[in-house]
């Protein structure tokens, strides 16, 4: 880290003794004390942090104890500084000063300033503004006060109200010697800025000739002053004339001091002094945005903080993939809460530019210099940049600098307005309005009134784009009928000429809120020409949508207000009113408003009706202008208003015509019923629909008849226990649905028709089935009466015939509704939007156990699960749901799909279902129920014509549609190619297989090889098929031939993953299957080696889906969608083509994915029988002729071999000493390898003969057999056969080993003889030590290799992940994480020898699990166990089986194993309240701080005690701290990107750091002491923002590492350790003596202010930064949540909760007990166990009495720690506890999730063997024996290491079947039957 610079004085002081340093610091203290006494009154205002920093940098004194509140503290502090620090120092030297416009109390303060005090003065005030009356008191008079002449005058904050003439007159009259004046005026105005450069200190606005100044941005404190009166800033002198003599007198104007907007001027008679020609201001922490972004913007922003911009730019430059979201997140992190929206948009624009185009480099090439030179010479360069025809963004970015400006002074400066006009001269003087819109943005263009002057042609030229489409909603609503609300129209001046459409404007707030439910007035925007071509922005499109919605609501509102019920009533009213309307071409002049009828309601005239529809619509968009609408409109009439206008003429003739519109029905008769948006309509005619319903096939249900109709047929619909028959919507029901779509704007596609019996009731419910989104729902009351009730209001709605009820979108989430039928035959139609089908799980729940008898019967016959059949034939399942059962037709459909035959015996005889083959079973159909009568034995699984589908979890579709997409994301080196199946190549391999030349189990005559292809039923058919495939049949006429010919017109995409040996070719795809597709039966892996199959099975592929190439061809592939060909080079030539042929014949080729994995540099397939018959081209070259992406690196081979092969390796091991040594024979090689401790795992030979020869030396394999395997060490035999091997086989041999290998001669002669006879190849290069070059190796490949090399750090730097990609979903956290290169320290490897105990055979008596059941009698009734409240009980103990109960039968849950323990759930309010009451304490911040301050001395005392027992050196190890920060970030980023993105809300910078989210942990409390207990309070968890974790977690990790490194051996902390380490500690220190345990009460709550003081003092000793410590104290003292502020306490979920709990536990133990040196003690959070009998002491009682932390002392001979028994033989977990947990998992169907972890706990006790009798009583031994039998019998369920462990332990069991319970064990202190008694001796 970088150290700060220290001056020589600081260096000297740091070396002086402490006493001398204190003497010098005493002087500084006295000086600060005096200064504070003098200035505290004027500089103690509380200022925001940014303002404080600015004042400090400006040299303004601020009191360190700022507490005084003020409305504008910043400007007040600045004024005081100017008065008492600056002005006083200048005017104090005068004997007399006349003071104007200043309060007396300020002058009295200036009297008390010591050396700078003002001695003699007069206060002469006058009233300038209205506030001066109150400011100066009643003595001030409005006339000018007498002011002495030729004296010294000081004017305070008034001169900015004086004009230049007034100041000149004042100087002329009084002729002062010295005039000192303070001026408040933002200087940036004179530089052309319209906004403040110090917005945190002041802001201003310019309104015409006035300047509105707002101190601290507070608008209520603002005052107005003339804009022109800032002339002093640009004046160098003022010239006046003597009234008597007329002589000119020059007064010099000097700017003595300027800070912000406050200035001090000294005006005095001119002397021969240099003038101030330039006044310089700045630099400010801003930059001119216009200098970077020259293009026009919608809303201008002039400045932006430069420091923030630099940090964002540097951050963006450091990202590999900069994006807009990251930049905005960084802006939010760097800014306070008061961030402007314009700044966000600016950063978005900047980041978008960087993301899209990047930034050019700083260095410049020749052509780059030429381009810059050419750009500089361009004429109109700035104009070209503004309109986007040229760009110099990078150079503008490089030239950004802090904002600064100069003001040049003169004797006669320009006025401020003239200066502004001069700066903006281009805009104001330009008459080219097109240029104005480009330069200044459309918004400003409109505001400055440029729009009326722009002609249509000019606008079209400016923004070419697209046509404006015609409106389909009313654009005008002006008529006498709408007179209840003030409605006006607005248009531009060229309205008639441009045929623009006016917009509706509601001037009344009341009308606005009633009509549109908005709260503010609508804005009037000029409409665009209807005939022009204009490109619309997203803003315009959104505005247009809002305008349409507003217009429709307006019309609806007024029609409802007119109280018309139908169209006819509206037509009558319109006729009555229209007789009074007369319109002519000149228009009718009226005062106040336009009287017009809605244009969209008019029918076109006869002439127009003959025209084209487009023209008629265009004409309807034009209306005559009403010239007399208002004075304003009349005044703005353009000179060409007399042009004849076309439009709809609203005369008597037109009005007499019918005024019907197809849209009008939509607005008449509607009634809004409640605020939730419920709408009712009346007067609808559904007689035709009622007639159609009478003829519909409705299903009889309880109290009604019903059916479901869909536009998107077929769909199923059901809910609860009811399902409905489904039909396609046709006829009138379809017409009604389409009409409702148009009327309501909702895409209805389903209708539920129900005919009710009288009195039928539907209770309160919501239509929230999973097939729906929260769209609108329309209920049509076709016939009959009903009452409709909702929860959104209390009124009951009566539904009559023809009524409609619309429940809008979002209604179902918040409200429910109920219906009561009031008449027989009442018919309703409910229209909904059926978005999706029900899930498979929902359908399965509906039919399972009730309607699934057919699926169960067929599944039993064909040995499958019913769910698999349902998934394979989903439409049969849908019919079963709709019809509530299956029929014979469904059975036939299932058999036809599976191509099987099943007999079904029913009431009408025997029926055969299916037509293929013999019957494989018989079913009975009795009483609408299918059951199995008999099942014939069949080789169903081996037939190619049977189908193996996928599981019932929908994995098939998941694999089909998603796998190749996901594979592209996780595998960067994926290769793909489009392949056409080569039939001749496939035919050759097929014939070779049938003839027995290839393979061993595919011969046609002996192994029924004809079963490989679907549709082939005999050998003869297969022979004909082979001839057809090879093209040897001239005119074949069959379906098979047509099927094969289809392949000539198909291309299949093949994917490939290729790489060097050990490069991890299968790693990504295996991880993908393991994490996302595990257990899918839609996957088939084809492996040529048995060991490869084992690897795939461990990675999540079912063993039965891993095939050799022959078994793959003979098996059924119909249910597969993913085919992985591992080591494709070892597959026979033509296999891929034959496999694709087989897939095509079964109809799955198009929807399947094929992935090939292999290495072109390794050995390929070879068989002497078929070598001359099959194609010569290998599979890789055949499929990927254009080359493959190749992983040119390895994780396997050591550095020695990697160097020889010119490849990079991630294996850090250099190589064994015998690496590549050649020994004379095998015994010599074996001897020397074993002597150096290199165990030989394999011997590789070149031929099978050699394999037999060396078989007695151990594991021997040929080069080809070892392909794909990995070993540590081995021997390669050099024989004559090895000389003949290809380089590919040699490559296989030398790349099998991690650590290394040696050679052994296997031929006669010496090493030199062998080397001389070798050919020049890879083997010769390796044996000679020369090595092979990259070119040599790549030249041996059959295809072009596109190398993908790993970026391997040459030193210790390793970048282990793409952190930016991982953080893509959490841009807030991205800004907190270090994204640079990480460095890992590589620790030297050492060999650790660990002795293992000999296993002891153990005889375990057999015990029946039935004997363990009676213990459940200890469970009390639920009413005695639960918490009870006013509104019910808690819900910790289950009594009844829930709907998802998966146990074979529903048992009494009150006696289940889960009922033994309390369960906490998030929705259990009483448990949560109990948790709050027990585990939380509340207090205010002031009390927390006060208590902490009082406890600081106690904290130091506790730290001293702690360090006495755990000595730790004071100071900080910065390297270790950096490493901890790196480890924390790596751990944080080790989660998947999806998981990080899901928690992104925790990274939000707006999350208050002193607030947490509190919730309760959902868990089953399976601790031993919780068995059979009453309800327990929940465990509260705290969720902190990520900023807290990022800040403190690295320091906590550092503390943990330092503590661990310095911890004495006799202390054990169970953190980041496994149980084997705890076992070693117990064996080492446990001696069977009495042990001591501390049982803490409310441990987290008890960690109060005293513990916090201890933590702070200890962490300071550890080297924590003081800033971090202060932040930690603040967090602990101010933390709160929605419930209120917390007292100082510990929270579960807080960073490093375990560490701080452990520290508190340790210091309490050291205070409570006498702990001699060497005493073994285990600590883990609040758990403590001392393995010796410690004596309690009262030495530290005065401290312990102050602690809230209390503990009960427990002495025992059976110590328990973290739920484990500690004994001299190791660890034991209570067997009954494991047994009951297992039973709970079995009850809940979660055995597979927990069996491995429970086995791990069990194994510690199991490996103790006979020694277990010394530690367990007989009851626990019975549990242990039952567990032993369970794990042995279910070992096939174990995975990973557990499977190996059970195999190692299995032989220890020596059961003989006797049920020997042994002797009894009485109560003991800790254990099975009693937790309070002392342990007794075993009675065996």
Curated annotation (Swiss-Prot):
Region named Disordered: 602-648
Keywords: ATP-binding, Helicase, Hydrolase, Nucleotide-binding, Nucleotidyltransferase, RNA-directed RNA polymerase, Transferase, Viral RNA replication
Annotated ranges, domain Alphavirus-like MT: 63-232
GO molecular function: ATP binding; helicase activity; hydrolase activity; mRNA methyltransferase activity; RNA binding; RNA-directed RNA polymerase activity
The enzyme's E.C. designation: 2.7.7.48
Biased composition (Basic and acidic residues): 611-622, 629-648
Residues binding ATP: 1059-1066
Catalytic reaction equation(s): RNA(n) + a ribonucleoside 5'-triphosphate = RNA(n+1) + diphosphate
PROSITE patterns: ALPHAVIRUS_MT, FE2OG_OXY, PSRV_HELICASE, RDRP_SSRNA_POS
InterPro entries attached to this UniProt entry: (+)RNA_virus_helicase_core_dom, AlkB-like_sf, Alphavirus-like_MT_dom, DNA/RNA_pol_sf, Oxoglu/Fe-dep_dioxygenase_dom, P-loop_NTPase, RNA-dep_RNA_pol_alsuvir, RNA-dir_pol_ACLSV
Name of the protein described by the UniProt record: RNA-directed RNA polymerase
Organism expressing this protein natively: Apple chlorotic leaf spot virus (isolate plum P863) (ACLSV)
Lineage: Viruses, Riboviria, Orthornavirae, Kitrinoviricota, Alsuviricetes
């Amino acid at each position: 880290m970088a150290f700060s610079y220290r001056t020589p004085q600081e260096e000297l002081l740091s070396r002086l003794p402490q006493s001398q340093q204190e003497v010098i610091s005493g002087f500084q203290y006295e000086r600060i004390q005096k200064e504070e006494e003098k200035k505290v009154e004027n500089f103690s205002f509380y200022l925001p942090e940014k303002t404080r920093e600015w004042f400090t940098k400006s040299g303004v004194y601020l009191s360190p104890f700022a507490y005084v509140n003020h409305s504008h503290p910043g400007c007040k502090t600045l004024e005081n500084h100017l008065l008492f620090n600056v002005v006083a120092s200048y005017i104090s030297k005068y004997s007399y000063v006349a003071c104007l416009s200043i309060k007396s109390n300020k002058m009295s303060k200036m009297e008390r300033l010591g050396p700078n005090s003002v001695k003699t003065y007069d206060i002469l005030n006058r009233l300038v503004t209205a506030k001066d009356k109150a400011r100066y008191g009643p003595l001030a008079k409005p006339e000018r006060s007498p002011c002495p002449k030729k004296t010294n005058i000081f004017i305070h904050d008034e001169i900015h109200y004086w004009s230049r003439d007034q100041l000149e007159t004042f100087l002329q009259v009084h002729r002062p010697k010295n005039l000192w004046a303070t001026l408040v005026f933002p200087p940036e105005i004179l530089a052309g800025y319209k906004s403040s450069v110090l917005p945190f200190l002041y802001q201003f606005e310019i309104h015409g000739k006035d300047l509105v100044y707002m101190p601290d941005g507070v608008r209520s404190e603002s005052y107005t002053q003339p804009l022109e009166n800032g002339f002093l800033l640009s004046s160098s002198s003022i010239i006046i004339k003597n009234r008597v003599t007329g002589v000119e007198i020059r007064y010099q104007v000097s700017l003595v001091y300027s800070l912000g907007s406050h200035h001090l001027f000294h005006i005095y008679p001119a002397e021969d002094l240099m003038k101030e020609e330039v006044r310089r201001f700045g630099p400010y922490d801003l930059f001119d945005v216009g200098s970077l972004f020259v293009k026009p913007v919608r809303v201008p922003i002039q400045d932006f903080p430069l420091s923030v911009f630099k940090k964002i730019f540097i951050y963006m430059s450091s990202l590999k993939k900069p994006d807009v979201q990251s930049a905005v997140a960084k802006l939010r992190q760097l800014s306070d809460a008061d961030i402007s929206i314009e700044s966000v948009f600016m950063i978005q624009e900047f980041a978008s530019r960087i993301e899209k185009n990047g930034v050019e480099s700083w260095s410049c090439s020749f052509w780059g210099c030429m381009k810059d030179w050419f750009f500089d010479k361009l004429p109109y360069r700035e104009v070209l940049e503004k309109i986007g025809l040229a760009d110099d963004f990078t150079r503008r970015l490089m030239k950004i600098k802090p904002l600064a400006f100069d003001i040049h002074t003169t004797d006669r400066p320009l006025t401020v307005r003239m200066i502004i006009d001069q700066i903006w001269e281009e805009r104001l003087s330009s008459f080219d309005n097109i240029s104005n819109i480009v330069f200044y943005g459309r918004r400003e263009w409109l505001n400055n009134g440029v729009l009326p002057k722009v002609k249509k042609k000019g606008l079209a030229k400016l923004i070419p784009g697209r046509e404006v489409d015609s409106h389909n909603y009313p654009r005008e609503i002006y008529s006498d009928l709408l007179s209840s609300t003030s409605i006006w129209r607005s248009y531009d001046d060229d309205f008639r000429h441009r045929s623009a459409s006016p917009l509706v404007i509601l001037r009344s707030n009341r009308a606005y809120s009633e009509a549109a439910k908005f709260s503010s007035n609508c804005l009037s925007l000029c409409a665009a020409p209807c005939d022009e071509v204009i490109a619309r922005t997203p803003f315009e499109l959104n505005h247009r949508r809002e305008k349409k919605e507003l217009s429709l609501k307006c019309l609806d509102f007024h029609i409802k207000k007119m109280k018309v019920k139908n169209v006819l009533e509206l037509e009558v009213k319109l006729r009555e009113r229209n007789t009074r309307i007369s319109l002519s071409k000149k228009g009718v002049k009226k005062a106040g408003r336009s009287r017009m009828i809605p244009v969209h309601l008019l029918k076109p005239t006869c002439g127009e009706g003959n025209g084209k529809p487009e023209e008629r619509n265009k004409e309807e968009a034009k209306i005559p202008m009403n010239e007399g609408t208002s004075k304003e409109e009349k005044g703005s009439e353009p000179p060409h208003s007399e042009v004849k206008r076309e439009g709809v003429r609203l005369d008597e003739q037109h009005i007499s015509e019918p005024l019907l519109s197809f849209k009008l029905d939509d607005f008449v008769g509607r009634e809004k019923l409640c605020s939730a948006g419920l709408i009712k309509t009346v007067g609808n005619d559904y007689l035709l629909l009622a007639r159609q319903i009478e003829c519909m096939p409705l299903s009889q249900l309880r109290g009604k008849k019903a059916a479901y109709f869909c536009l998107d047929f077929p769909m199923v619909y059901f809910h609860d226990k009811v399902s409905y028959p489904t039909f396609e919507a046709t006829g009138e029901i379809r017409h009604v649905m389409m009409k409702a779509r148009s009327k309501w704007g909702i895409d209805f596609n389903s209708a539920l028709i129900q005919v009710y019996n009288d009195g039928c009731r539907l209770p309160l419910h919501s239509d929230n089935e999973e097939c729906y989104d929260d769209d609108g729902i329309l209920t049509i009351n076709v016939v009959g009466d009903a009452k409709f009730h909702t929860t959104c209001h209390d009124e009951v709605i009566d539904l009559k015939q023809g009524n409609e009820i619309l429940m809008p979108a979002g209604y179902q989430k918040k409200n429910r509704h109920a219906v009561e039928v009031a008449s027989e035959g009442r018919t309703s139609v409910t229209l909904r939007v059926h978005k999706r089908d029900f899930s498979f799980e929902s359908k399965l729940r509906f039919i399972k156990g009730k309607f699934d008898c057919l699926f169960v019967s067929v599944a039993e016959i064909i040995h499958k699960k019913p769910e698999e059949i349902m998934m394979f034939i989903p439409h049969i399942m849908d019919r079963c749901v709709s019809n509530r059962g299956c029929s014979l037709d469904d059975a036939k459909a299932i058999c036809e799909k599976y191509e099987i035959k099943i007999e079904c015996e029913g009431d009408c005889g025997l029926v055969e279902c299916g037509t293929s083959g013999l019957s494989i079973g018989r079913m009975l159909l009795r009483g609408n129920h299918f059951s199995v009568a008999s099942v014939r034995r069949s080789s169903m699984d081996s037939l190619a014509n049977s189908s193996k589908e996928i599981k019932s979890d929908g994995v098939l579709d998941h694999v089909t549609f998603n796998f190749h997409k996901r594979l592209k994301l996780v595998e960067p080196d994926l290769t793909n190619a489009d392949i056409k199946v080569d039939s001749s190549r496939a035919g050759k391999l097929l014939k070779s297989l049938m003839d027995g030349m290839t393979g061993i189990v595919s011969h046609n005559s002996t192994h029924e090889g004809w079963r490989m292809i679907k549709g082939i039923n005999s050998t003869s058919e297969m022979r004909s098929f082979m001839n057809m495939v090879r093209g040897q049949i001239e005119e074949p006429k069959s379906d098979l031939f047509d099927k094969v010919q289809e392949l000539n017109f198909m291309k299949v995409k093949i994917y490939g993953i290729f790489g060097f040996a050990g490069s991890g070719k299968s790693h990504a795809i295996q991880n993908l299957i393991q994490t996302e597709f595990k257990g899918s039966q839609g996957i088939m892996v084809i492996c040529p080696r048995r060991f490869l199959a084992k690897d795939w099975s461990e990675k999540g592929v079912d063993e039965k889906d891993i095939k050799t190439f022959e078994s793959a061809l003979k098996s059924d592939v119909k249910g597969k969608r993913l085919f992985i060909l591992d080591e494709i080079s070892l597959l026979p030539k033509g296999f891929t083509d034959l496999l694709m042929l087989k897939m095509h014949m079964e109809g799955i080729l198009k929807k399947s994915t094929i992935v090939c994995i292999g290495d072109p540099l390794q050995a390929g397939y070879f068989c002497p029988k078929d070598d001359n018959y099959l194609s010569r081209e290998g599979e890789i070259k055949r499929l990927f002729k254009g080359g493959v992406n190749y992983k040119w690196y390895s994780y396997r081979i050591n550095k020695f071999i990697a160097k020889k092969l010119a490849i990079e390796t991630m294996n850090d091991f250099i190589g064994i000493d015998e690496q590549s040594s050649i020994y004379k024979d095998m015994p010599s090689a074996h001897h020397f390898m074993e002597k150096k401790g290199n165990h030989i795992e394999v011997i590789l030979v070149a031929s099978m003969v050699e394999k037999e020869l060396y078989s007695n030396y151990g594991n021997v394999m040929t080069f080809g057999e070892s392909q794909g395997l990995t070993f540590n060490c081995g021997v390669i035999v050099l024989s004559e056969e090895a000389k003949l091997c290809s380089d590919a086989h040699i490559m296989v041999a030398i790349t099998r080993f991690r650590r290394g290998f040696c050679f052994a001669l296997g031929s006669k002669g010496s090493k030199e003889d062998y080397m001389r006879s070798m050919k020049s190849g890879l083997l010769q290069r390796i044996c000679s030590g020369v090595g092979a070059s990259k070119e040599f190796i790549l030249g041996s490949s059959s295809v072009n290799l596109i190398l993908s090399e790993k970026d391997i750090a040459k030193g210790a730097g390793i970048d282990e992940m793409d952190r930016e990609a991982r953080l893509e979903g959490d841009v807030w956290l991205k800004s907190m994480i270090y994204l640079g290169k990480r460095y890992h320290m590589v620790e030297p490897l050492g060999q650790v020898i660990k002795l293992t105990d000999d296993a002891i055979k153990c005889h375990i008596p057999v015990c029946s699990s039935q004997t363990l059941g009676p213990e459940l009698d200890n469970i009390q009734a639920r009413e005695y166990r639960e918490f009870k409240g006013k509104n019910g009980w808690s819900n910790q103990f289950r009594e009844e089986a829930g709907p998802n109960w998966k146990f074979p039968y529903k048992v009494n849950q009150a006696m289940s194993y889960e009922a033994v323990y309390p369960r906490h759930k998030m929705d259990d309010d009483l448990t949560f309240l109990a948790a709050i009451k027990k585990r939380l304490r509340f207090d205010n911040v002031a009390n927390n701080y006060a208590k902490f301050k009082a406890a600081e001395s106690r904290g130091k005392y506790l730290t001293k005690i702690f360090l006495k027992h755990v000595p730790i050196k004071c100071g900080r190890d910065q390297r270790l701290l950096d490493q901890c920060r790196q480890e924390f970030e790596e751990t944080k980023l080790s989660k998947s990107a999806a998981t990080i993105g899901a928690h992104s809300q925790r990274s939000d910078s707006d999350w208050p750091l002193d607030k947490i989210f509190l919730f309760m942990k959902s868990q089953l409390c399976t601790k031993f002491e919780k068995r059979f207990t009453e309800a327990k309070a929940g465990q509260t968890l705290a969720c902190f923002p990520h900023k807290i974790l990022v800040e403190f977690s690295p320091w906590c990790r550092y503390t943990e590492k330092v503590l661990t490194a310095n911890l004495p051996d006799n202390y054990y902390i169970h953190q980041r350790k496994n149980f084997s380490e705890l076992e070693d500690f117990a064996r080492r220190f446990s001696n069977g003596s009495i042990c001591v345990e501390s049982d803490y009460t409310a441990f987290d709550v008890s960690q109060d202010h005293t513990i916090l003081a201890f933590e702070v003092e200890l962490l300071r000793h550890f080297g924590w930064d003081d800033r971090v410590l202060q932040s930690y104290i603040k967090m602990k003292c101010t933390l709160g949540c929605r419930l209120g502020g917390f007292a100082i306490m510990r929270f579960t979920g807080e960073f490093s909760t375990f560490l701080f709990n452990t520290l508190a536990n340790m210091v309490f133990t050291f205070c409570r007990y006498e702990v001699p040196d060497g005493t073994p003690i285990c600590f883990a959070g609040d758990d403590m166990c001392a393995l010796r009998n410690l004596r309690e002491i009262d030495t530290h009682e005065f401290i312990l009495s102050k602690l809230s932390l209390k503990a009960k002392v427990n002495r025992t001979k059976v110590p328990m720690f973290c739920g484990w028994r500690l004994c001299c033989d190791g660890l034991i977990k209570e067997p009954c506890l494991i047994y009951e947990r297992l039973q709970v998992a079995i009850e809940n169907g979660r055995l597979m999730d927990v069996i491995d972890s429970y086995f791990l706990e069990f194994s510690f006790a199991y490996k103790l063997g006979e020694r277990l009798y010394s530690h367990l009583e007989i009851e626990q031994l019975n549990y242990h024996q039952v567990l032993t039998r369970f794990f042995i019998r279910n070992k096939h369920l174990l995975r990973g290491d557990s499977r190996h462990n059970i195999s190692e332990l299995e032989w220890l069991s020596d059961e003989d079947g006797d049920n020997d319970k042994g002797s009894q064990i009485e109560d003991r202190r800790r254990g099975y039957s009693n937790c309070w008694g002392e342990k007794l001796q075993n009675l065996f």
